[in-house]
């Protein structure tokens, strides 16, 4: 055995046996949402320890070890002993008691989003890929603003056990989207855009998270099985959640993504150091929409694969995260083309009040009109120390439009500039006026711009 192999083995053994002193923050959409909603500034709870304060990404470290509980009814007895209604009925007290007694965290996000847009009438049809090469009767799409979106997203995480053998965490998240009057898809057709004016352009039901995770001792390795989506890790703090940050399709998610909104599978995650994280996994290729959990698809032997690497350094300026996602999707009836995609995300706190981010993503094939995107922006949270929900953001996305993806595409590029200001009203309610400016709509050569005005009302409990 060579000296190099012995040295490498020793270093790996040392890294896996050393307890992580302060795990750095790696972005996860639903875990972050749970942490944010269960750590409001005005929660009546003991002050967190120094270890809890520096480890914001670990749910289990903030919960009472369930290995100390005895009996099936222990969580109920502990919940009663917490006496959450001693000083009156309060949502925050109930959630805190539920977390302390049963190791459960709950987040409920409900938003109402009216959007006004201009222009309102198209001048040419927006044909589907099936119409390519055929002479279709040209129709005019007309939409009457505003379009009202109602989005409800409940999430929960339950620590089932916490012992010397590791921790078991069950996590669930569901998204329900409904529209009144026009929907965003019709508005986008009328404006003749390649990208939508929000993250959910039509009525949707998405089972985005239904997983069980086994975190092994020292939290270096974890194995997750169940239904999940890569949207949870593909992004940064404010460009991956329409209910919190930017609203437009190109700035609220990866607009080139061809992976599933939620599908059954498994992934293995390894943290070689406190600031790095590696992930590899697979999913059923048939469930594209994630509207339900389809167990029978696992026997059809078609799977999507992904690899993910994240680095979350801490410097004198503040914390940051830099990640790369690679994925391959198979050809299935719901998506008639095999694709390979990538997404590179970078974010950095310049100070406690300034956060900058960027994304470069792309995909092969012609599944969606947008096949490349470059975006960057900045955000400032609680700039005036008035309310923790206060947030100001501005960003820009340059979208490369594939000419063969839609027969009506007239331009190769479409640019969106967006700015918003979230104003917190108490610990749970917020309002966010938002403005989107589209330069050179890809499907409308006779217009140089299109505009969208929005006011998002969000209740986060």
Curated annotation (Swiss-Prot):
One of its GO terms (cellular component) is pore complex. The keyword Signal applies. It comes from the Bacteria. It holds the Pfam family OprB. It is found in: Cell outer membrane. Residues 1-22 form the signal peptide. InterPro entries: Carb-sel_porin_OprB (IPR007049), OprB_sf (IPR038673). Keywords: Amino-acid transport, Cell outer membrane, Ion transport, Membrane, Porin, Signal, Transmembrane, Transmembrane beta strand, Transport, Virulence. The keyword NADP does not apply. Its main location: membrane. One of its GO terms (biological process) is carbohydrate transport. It is a multi-pass membrane protein. One of its GO terms (molecular function) is porin activity. Belongs to the OprB family. Facilitates L-arginine uptake, as part of the AaxABC system. The arginine uptake by the bacterium in the macrophage may be a virulence factor against the host innate immune response. This is Porin AaxA. It comes from Chlamydia trachomatis serovar D (strain ATCC VR-885 / DSM 19411 / UW-3/Cx). The lineage of its organism: Bacteria, Pseudomonadati, Chlamydiota, Chlamydiia, Chlamydiales.
């Amino acid at each position: 055995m060579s000296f190099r192999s012995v040295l490498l083995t020793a270093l790996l053994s040392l890294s896996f046996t050393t307890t992580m002193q302060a795990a750095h923050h790696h972005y996860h959409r639903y875990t972050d949402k749970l942490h944010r909603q269960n750590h409001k500034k005005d929660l009546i709870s003991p002050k967190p320890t120094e270890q809890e304060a520096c480890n914001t990404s670990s749910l289990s470290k903030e919960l009472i070890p369930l290995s100390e509980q005895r009996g099936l009814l222990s969580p109920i007895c502990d919940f009663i002993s917490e006496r959450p209604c001693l000083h009156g009925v309060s949502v925050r007290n109930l959630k805190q008691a539920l977390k302390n007694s049963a190791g459960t965290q709950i987040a409920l996000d409900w938003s109402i989003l009216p959007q006004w847009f201009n222009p309102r009438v198209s001048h040419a049809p927006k044909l589907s890929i099936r119409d390519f090469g055929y002479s279709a009767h040209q129709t005019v799409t007309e939409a009457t603003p505003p379009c009202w979106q109602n989005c409800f997203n409940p999430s929960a995480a339950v620590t089932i056990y916490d012992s010397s053998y590791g921790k078991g965490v069950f996590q669930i998240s569901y998204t329900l989207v409904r529209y009144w009057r026009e929907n965003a898809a019709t508005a986008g057709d009328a404006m003749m855009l390649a990208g939508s004016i929000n993250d959910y352009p039509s009525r949707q039901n998405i089972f985005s998270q239904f997983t069980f995770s086994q975190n092994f001792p020292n939290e270096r390795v974890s194995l997750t099985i169940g239904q999940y989506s890569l949207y949870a890790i593909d992004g940064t703090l404010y460009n991956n959640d329409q209910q919190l940050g930017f609203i437009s399709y190109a700035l609220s998610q990866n607009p080139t993504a061809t992976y599933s909104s939620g599908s059954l599978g498994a992934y293995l995650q390894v943290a070689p150091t406190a600031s790095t994280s590696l992930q590899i996994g697979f999913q059923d290729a048939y469930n594209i929409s994630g509207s339900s959990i389809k167990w029978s698809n696992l026997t059809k032997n078609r799977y999507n694969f992904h690899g993910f690497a994240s680095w979350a350094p801490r410097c004198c300026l503040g914390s940051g995260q830099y990640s790369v996602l690679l994925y391959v999707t198979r050809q299935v009836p719901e998506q008639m083309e095999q694709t390979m995609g990538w997404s590179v995300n970078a974010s950095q706190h310049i100070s406690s009040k300034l956060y900058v981010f960027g994304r470069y993503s792309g995909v092969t094939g012609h599944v969606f009109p947008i096949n490349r995107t470059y975006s960057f922006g900045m955000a400032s949270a609680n700039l005036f120390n008035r309310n923790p929900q206060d947030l100001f953001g501005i960003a820009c996305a340059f979208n490369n439009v594939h000419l063969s993806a839609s027969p009506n595409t007239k331009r190769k590029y479409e640019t969106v500039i967006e700015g918003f200001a979230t104003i917190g009203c108490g610990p749970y309610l917020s309002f966010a006026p938002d403005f989107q400016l589209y330069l050179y709509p890809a499907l409308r050569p006779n217009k140089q711009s299109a505009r969208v005005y929005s006011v998002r009302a969000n209740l986060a409990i």
